[in-house]
């Protein structure tokens, strides 16, 4: 019966990988600070939307008032946001404080499980009430045949955005 462990290995996905996306929200020296709304998604090189990974916004405002400012993340709103029913299960979350926040996805996550072989971007967009807006793209290829890290550095609303893939 030593065949079963070997069969289990053969049944594993051919390109299993863990994907980590870290987003730094910098401390800003402003009179009135509001935590930014942040959207993270996957797009093709032609900027067509593939999948949403996270949307951080004010979930707890009465009468869903927090949803009103989602459109300030203009690219997210145009690509996919306006067609979504919020909150989105498994995607929506509360705004985050200053610091670095890491999201981890395995190969079974719906966004990566059916992702065809090809080149893509992880897109991170941030917008802040009484503040600015910033968008960063981090290119990657899927599936990954070796471990790698790619990053982009923000200038205002975002700090370092880093994506690492570990097959």
Language-model segments: which ranges?
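Glycine-rich, aromatic-bearing surface loops/beta-hairpins
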Residues: 98-103, 111-167
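Calcium-binding acidic motifs and repeat modules
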Residues: 31, 44-47, 160-167
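Short amphipathic, basic-aromatic surface patches that mediate peripheral association
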Residues: 21-33, 56-60
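N-terminal Sec/ER secretory leader and immediately downstream segment
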Residues: 24, 39-45
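Structured domain cores in non-transmembrane regions
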Residues: 45-115
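Short coil-to-beta strand junction motifs in C2/discoidin
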Residues: 32-39, 117-120
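Sec/Tat signal peptide C-region and signal peptidase I cleavage site
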Residues: 12-18
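Cleavable N-terminal signal peptides
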Residues: 3-4, 14
């Amino acid at each position: 019966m030593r065949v079963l462990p070997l069969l289990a290995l053969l049944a594993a996905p051919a390109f299993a990988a863990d994907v980590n996306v870290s987003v730094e929200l910098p401390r800003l020296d402003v009179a009135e600070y509001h935590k930014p709304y942040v959207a993270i998604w996957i797009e093709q090189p032609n900027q067509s939307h593939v999948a949403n990974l996270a949307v951080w916004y004010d979930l707890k405002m009465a009468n869903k008032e927090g949803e009103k400012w989602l459109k300030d993340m203009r690219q997210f709103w145009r690509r996919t946001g306006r067609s979504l029913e919020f909150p989105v299960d498994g995607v929506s979350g509360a705004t985050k404080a200053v610091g670095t926040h890491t999201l981890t996805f395995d190969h079974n996550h719906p966004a990566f499980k059916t992702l065809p072989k090809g080149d893509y971007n992880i897109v991170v967009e941030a917008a802040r009430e009484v503040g600015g807006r910033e968008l960063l793209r981090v290119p990657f290829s899927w599936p990954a045949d070796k471990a790698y890290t790619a990053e982009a550095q923000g200038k205002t609303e975002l700090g370092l955005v880093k994506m690492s893939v570990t097959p």
